[in-house]
């Protein structure tokens, strides 16, 4: 399947391209992106290129799709996930995977998943980390605001309490 996407090749080097996605494996999911919110973190990744902690060092040879605040629907499900997801299911992405301690994240680090694309291949680690979240909202743009809202909530919890790790309000 063809997709159109904004891909990062290096510092301030974004390119809108149409290319063929690989056929999904049994452990992957093909999805359509409907809404992606724009974040200053994407600008930071664009400004820093491979110097950004989430952007791979070989981004010039293996570009990544930008955009990490996105919402869409499932198109095709690999065999491993057919008991949990089905075509037509709406989803949001939680991009902070922390998969095996890695900083790699959709929208920064992967060649076939990012919010600034029409179709994406969702890799196995997203599902293994529980980061493909069901979405039942009426408008997809609300779903793409889930990740920034989680940052607000996380910041509130991190700063509102007097003692780190203690969640009693002071």
Regions found by a protein language model. Name each.
Residues 44-52:
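Short Gly/aromatic-enriched secondary-structure transition segments
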Residues 16-18, 119:
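Well-ordered beta-strand positions in beta-sheet-rich domains
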Residues 22-36, 51-97, 114, 133-136:
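Glycine-rich beta-strand-centered segment in the early N-terminal region that forms part
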Residues 6-14:
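Extracellular beta-rich ligand/substrate-recognition surface
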Residues 97-170:
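NAD(P)H dinucleotide-binding glycine-rich loop of Rossmann-like/cofactor-binding domains
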Residues 40:
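Local cysteine-cluster metal-coordination motifs and their immediate loop/turn environment
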Residues 2-4:
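Extreme N-terminal starter segment of soluble prokaryotic enzymes
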């Amino acid at each position: 399947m063809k997709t159109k996407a904004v891909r990062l090749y290096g510092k301030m080097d974004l390119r809108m391209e149409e290319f063929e996605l690989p056929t999904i494996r049994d452990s992957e999911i093909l999805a359509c992106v409907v809404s992606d919110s724009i974040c200053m973190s994407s600008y930071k990744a664009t400004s820093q290129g491979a110097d950004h902690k989430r952007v791979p060092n070989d981004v010039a040879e293996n570009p990544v799709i930008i955009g990490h605040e996105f919402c869409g629907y499932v198109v095709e499900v690999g065999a491993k996930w057919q008991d949990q997801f089905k075509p037509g299911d709406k989803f949001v992405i939680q991009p902070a995977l922390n998969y095996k301690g890695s900083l790699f994240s959709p929208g920064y680090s992967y060649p076939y998943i990012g919010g600034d694309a029409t179709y994406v291949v969702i890799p196995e680690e997203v599902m293994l980390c529980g980061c493909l979240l069901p979405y039942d909202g009426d408008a997809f743009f609300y779903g793409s605001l889930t990740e920034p809202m989680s940052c607000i909530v996380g910041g509130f919890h991190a700063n509102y309490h007097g003692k780190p790790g203690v969640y009693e309000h002071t």
